[in-house]
Each structure stands twice: as structure tokens, then as C-alpha cells.
């Protein structure tokens, strides 16, 4: 498909690589430890973090439905947009309900830093796909009662909520990671970062 899209001058339709190196590199433990086998010996184990069909097209083949439905997707992040994309390709009529004024969800914060250009490329690709596929997107539309959808199927794609440390004195002054990364809440000169995972390390950096 990559070559076909280039030949058809449809380069913008190619899903961008985010350089995660998690699936496509020769990193599988096929013979005990990473990188001790020839690439040709592990090609069948290649995967892609942003394209489930990579080397698994039979498993993830998108089959057309015989009974198209209107499906309401609550949340317009990456998960919601991918759900809408696949549903549309299957022949359904997905409708995205996003309570904010833009698509992207937590991925907007995840791609905010200057060195996260590849993530921003992926986010832009999803937005283009929503437009090109003609998927209905309702921004500033917070869903409060799914009964309004009647019997239509509903997909919840709202993501996770941050854990508030209410037992810690002064928690009301805390800034949530996404708030900082999006620049919506400032911090002082001396900052205590609670959590040393990838997000905490990125914020400390």
C-alpha cells in the first residue's frame, strides 16, 4: 500500500511512523535474546505500534458489514478516531462526540513537546482521515445521557482520568501532567514531580 499510495500521489494518506522502535526493529526474543538473529529470520515477527495490519493483514482484515449501523463514539482521541476509521471502512456510520473543541484527546499533550513532531504528524494524519472518509465529528458536544441515541450502539473512548492524591496535604495546588504539557497551568521554579515513569521523566526533562 505504501508504494501504491506514492505512485498515486497520495503520500498524505500514508500513516506516519512515530519512531517508537517497539515492533518493526529486530528486537524479538526469537532465539533467546534480542538482535542475535538475522533480519530475514524474524521478518514474520515484525509489528507496528500504529498499524495493526502490519504483518498481520489476515488477522486484522477489515471486512465489509452486511448490516450497517450508526455508531456513536464518545471521545475524539486517537482511540476514538481509530474506532471511527475502522467502522467507516467496514461500512458503518460512525459519529464522534468530543466534548472539547478539537480532536486528539490526551495525545495533544503527549505530542506537545518540541521533539514530538512525529506524534503530531500521526495526529494530523488521523484528522485528515476523519475528513477524507466523511466521518461526522461533533465538537464541543459533551454526552451526558446515551439514552438520547435510542438503540444505536455506543463506544466509550474517553480514555483514563488522572488519579487525584486527595490524601496528600496541598493536593489542590497540584498540576496534572496533561495540564502542564499543554501549557494550561504554569508551575514555579522548584517543582516536585510525583511519579518517575515516562511521563514524569519527560516533564522533569
Tell where the protein language model's regions lie, with residue ranges.
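Residues in the short beta-alpha loop(s) of Rossmann-like NAD(P)-binding domains
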Residues: 100
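Short, contiguous acidic/charged loop-to-helix segments that flank catalytic cores in large enzymes
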Residues: 61-63, 68, 109-121, 176-183
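Rossmann-like dinucleotide/flavin-binding elements
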Residues: 68-97, 138-146, 150, 158-167, ...
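A short, gly/pro- and small-residue-rich
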Residues: 4-10, 167-182
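A short helix-to-beta-strand connector/capping loop
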Residues: 44, 130-137, 170-173
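Flavin-dependent oxidoreductase catalytic cores
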Residues: 1-74, 78, 82-89, 162-163, ...
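N-terminal Rossmann-like dinucleotide/flavin-binding domain of flavoprotein oxidoreductases
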Residues: 105-149
